């Protein structure tokens, strides 16, 4: 049926024909596009009142794309998924370091004992480097967090420490020859001992310190998905490096023509180790590009919120029977608060403008809104609601306006919006709006970082005013389209946030006092994790540093101080070589366990994996002292690799999990923000602390027991202690902050 010519089509009857600037005009009876609906008695809480009409206006069409220049988009927090080869090359430095460390642990003690170092002093060789590491490791971690080199934050430290390890290795394996060239004799090797000890200190400190920037380097350039894979690959490369290192050290190069041509066993080992360390360092440095850190005083380019006006709101609900017009002298007050749910994945928020145009300088970045976090949105919201040219807050000149008082949550310290944003102030901020006053106050909130717009509901409350002194009601209605547009606009722009730019700018320069304060105020989860890490390294280092000596003296019944032509001396050398093969078994078992550890984490909890590693190591070291069978002792080396892989992987994985908690990470606003480089260094310092204790205790313990059996007893006892501590004291999950307070706290409050 064709409608008559004079009738209005149904589609046009639903769409208002009033200009956008007339929506804030005093409502009159001619709002032809509205649909009338009566509110029931029950819906009004059974109150007596004149009948009211509710006007419903359909939402306008979807908004256009919200473009922004791509050069202003900050992709620093967005890490692409790394391939296996990128992670493999990134972990090559661990292969070279462990290859070098295998040579050090296998030959330092035999070389020093053969040069005449007393039994009571040979364990003190390991005392100097861990003290330096314990004192300097946190400083290196803090400096790497703040390094502004154009090569990145971590790679300069990796390069310097790799060079230091190479120099130490040169002194370690060639110290005896250099001493003979200086002033040593066949019976007096004082210069050789001194140079060898200096090489041990430099090599040990550099090799152990290189682990921390390499781990931090991987965590900086990888997202959370790739961090666990990267840690497992690091442990795998470390195990393979140690395994091949012990294989090279276990071969009798003196009996080969290649070894005789190069000058002997130690010379061949030095050449292999130097080449391996140099090549793997280069592979790591070129593996993944690292973004340089901005200098402290430099502000990153931030984008302003787009000046696209939001559509005006529908007219205010009026009681039936009220006048058709409002007197021009009636005071109008606007109260705004947000309380209706909006979230990025909500169907209320269609992804308009989700295109990326590399051809021009404009692109929409709504696809990345979910990764920017909610703390980036608040500054945009404040800027949108305080800008003088925003049309959706403008009132027509026909209606006199009064002061609009809006209270925002307190902005974190260091918060700023460039060029036209808010600055930090002690009191409320007052802005002019065409002669009016907009007072922006501050609200004391217990969680200032949790003030994101996407976590709060939104409504717009417009009070009905019947007269100048009449009572005001605070009925609220949902403005769905405005919510959608606000969400799109605010998600389409990335501002400075507390976790990125503003916090970096507000940080104070590094000082020893501030570093000591960070260590002193260490959170309890990190403190317990460090103690557990210390127990693990204490037991492991006691076995590792003296295992070849244990094989030569206890299993093979040799004597390192016997004459070189004696049978006891030859037995000791055979035991040292066989100890290298035992360490090779341990290293390859560590590599294999690292390869399957990711699958085991899907089946077993981290607590269970910790317990199993400590338990097997305690059983392995304890049983090794009870048996003299070579095959039994070598088979027990597989247990040692499980603990090594665990110590190289699980503590750092737990630390990454800790940093997923906002409460743990802290903020620069209250001075509680922590750097991951510092915490990684604090965790790695437990290795140095364990090595200090081992060097002080195991020498006298070995002399008291009369053999190297005391070392294995000590390692077994400490490992069982670690079993109990990892089960009872370590924090494996930090509970998330209570979101209820966050939802109850509105973003904008009436004043």
From Swiss-Prot:
This is Proton-associated sugar transporter A. It comes from the Eukaryota. Proton-associated glucose transporter in the brain. Predominantly expressed in brain. It is found in: Membrane. GO terms for molecular function: D-glucose:proton symporter activity; galactose:proton symporter activity; sucrose:proton symporter activity. The keyword Transmembrane helix applies. It holds the Pfam family MFS_1. GO terms for cellular component: membrane. The chain crosses the membrane at residues 93-113, 123-143, 155-175, 191-211, 233-253, 268-288, 536-556, 576-596, 606-626, 630-650, 688-708, 710-730. Belongs to the glycoside-pentoside-hexuronide (GPH) cation symporter transporter (TC 2.A.2) family. It catalyses: D-galactose(in) + H(+)(in) = D-galactose(out) + H(+)(out); D-glucose(out) + H(+)(out) = D-glucose(in) + H(+)(in). It is a multi-pass membrane protein. InterPro entries: MFS (IPR011701), MFS_trans_sf (IPR036259). Gene3D superfamilies: MFS general substrate transporter like domains. The modification Phosphothreonine is found at residue 500. Its main location: membrane. Keywords: Membrane, Phosphoprotein, Sugar transport, Symport, Transmembrane, Transmembrane helix, Transport. The gene is Slc45a1. GO terms for biological process: D-glucose transmembrane transport; galactose transmembrane transport. CDD domains: MFS_SLC45_SUC (cd17313). Optimum pH is 6.5.
């Amino acid at each position: 049926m064709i409608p008559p010519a004079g009738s209005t089509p149904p589609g046009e009857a639903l769409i208002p024909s009033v200009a956008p600037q007339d929506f804030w005009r005093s409502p009159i009876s001619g709002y032809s596009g509205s649909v009338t609906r009566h509110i029931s008695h029950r819906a009004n809480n059974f109150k007596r009142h004149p009948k009211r009409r509710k006007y419903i206006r359909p939402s306008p069409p979807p908004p256009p794309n919200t473009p922004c220049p791509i050069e202003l988009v900050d992709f620093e927090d967005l890490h692409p998924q790394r391939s296996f080869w990128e992670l493999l090359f990134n972990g090559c430095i661990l292969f070279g370091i462990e290859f070098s460390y295998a040579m050090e642990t296998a030959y330092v003690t035999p070389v020093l004992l053969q040069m005449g170092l007393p039994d009571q002093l040979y364990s003190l060789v390991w005392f100097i480097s861990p003290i330096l590491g314990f004192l300097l490791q946190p400083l290196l971690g803090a400096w790497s967090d703040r390094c502004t080199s154009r090569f990145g934050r971590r790679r300069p430290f990796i390069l310097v420490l790799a060079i230091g390890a190479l120099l130490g290795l040169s002194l370690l394996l060639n110290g005896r020859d250099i001493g003979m060239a200086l002033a040593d004799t066949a019976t007096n090797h004082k210069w050789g001992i001194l140079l060898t000890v200096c090489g041990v200190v430099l090599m040990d400190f550099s090799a152990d310190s290189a682990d921390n920037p390499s781990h931090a380097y991987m965590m900086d350039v990888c997202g959370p998905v790739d961090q666990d894979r990267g840690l497992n690959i690091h442990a795998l490369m470390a195990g393979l490096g140690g395994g091949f290192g012990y294989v090279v050290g276990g071969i009798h190069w003196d009996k080969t023509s290649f070894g005789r041509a190069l000058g002997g066993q130690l010379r061949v080992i030095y050449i292999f180790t130097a080449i391996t360390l140099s090549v793997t360092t280069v592979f790591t440095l070129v593996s993944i590009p690292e973004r340089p850190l901005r200098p402290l005083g430099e502000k990153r380019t931030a984008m302003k919120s787009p000046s696209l006006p939001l559509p005006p709101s529908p007219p205010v609900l009026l009681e039936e029977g009220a006048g058709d017009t409002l007197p021009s002298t009636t005071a109008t007050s606007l109260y705004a608060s947000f309380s209706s749910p909006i979230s990025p994945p909500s169907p209320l928020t269609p992804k308009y403008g989700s295109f990326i145009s590399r051809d021009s300088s404009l692109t929409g970045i709504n696809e990345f809104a979910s990764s920017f976090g909610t703390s980036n949105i608040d500054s945009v919201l404040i800027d949108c609601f305080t800008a003088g040219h925003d049309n959706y807050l403008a009132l027509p000149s026909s209606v006199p306006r009064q002061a609009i008082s809006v209270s925002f949550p307190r902005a974190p310290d260091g918060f700023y919006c460039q060029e036209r944003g808010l600055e930090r102030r002690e009191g409320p901020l007052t802005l002019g709006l065409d002669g009016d006053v907009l007072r922006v106050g501050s609200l004391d909130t217990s969680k200032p970082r949790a003030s994101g717009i996407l976590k709060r509901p939104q409504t717009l409350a417009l009070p009905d005013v019947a007269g100048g002194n009449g009572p005001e009601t605070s009925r609220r209605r949902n403005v769905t389209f405005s919510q959608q547009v606000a969400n799109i606009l605010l998600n389409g722009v990335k501002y400075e946030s507390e976790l990125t730019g503003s916090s970096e700018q507000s940080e104070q320069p590094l000082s020893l006092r501030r570093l000591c304060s960070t260590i002193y105020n260490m959170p309890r989860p990190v403190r317990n994790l460090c103690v557990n890490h210390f127990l693990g390294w204490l037991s492991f280092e006691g076995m590792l540093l003296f295992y070849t000596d244990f094989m030569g003296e206890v299993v093979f019944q040799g004597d390192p101080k016997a004459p070189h032509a004696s049978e006891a001396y030859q037995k000791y050398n055979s035991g040292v070589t066989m100890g290298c093969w035992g360490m090779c078994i341990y290293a390859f078992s560590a590599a294999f366990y690292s390869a399957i550890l990711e699958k085991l984490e899907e089946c077993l909890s981290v607590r269970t994996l910790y317990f199993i590693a400590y338990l097997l190591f305690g059983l392995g070291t304890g049983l090794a002292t009870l048996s003299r069978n070579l095959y039994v002792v070598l088979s027990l080396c597989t247990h040692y690799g499980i603990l090594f892989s665990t110590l190289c992987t699980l503590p750092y994985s737990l630390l990454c999990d800790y940093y997923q908690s906002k409460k743990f990470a802290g903020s620069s606003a209250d001075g509680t923000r922590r750097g991951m480089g510092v915490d990684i260094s604090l965790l790695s310092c437990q290795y140095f602390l364990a090595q200090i204790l081992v060097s002080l205790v195991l020498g006298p313990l070995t002399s008291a027991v009369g053999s190297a059996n005391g070392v294995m007893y000590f390692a077994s006892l400490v490992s069982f202690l670690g079993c109990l501590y990892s089960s009872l004291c370590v924090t494996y999950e930090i509970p998330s902050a209570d979101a209820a307070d966050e939802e109850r706290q509105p973003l904008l409050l009436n004043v």
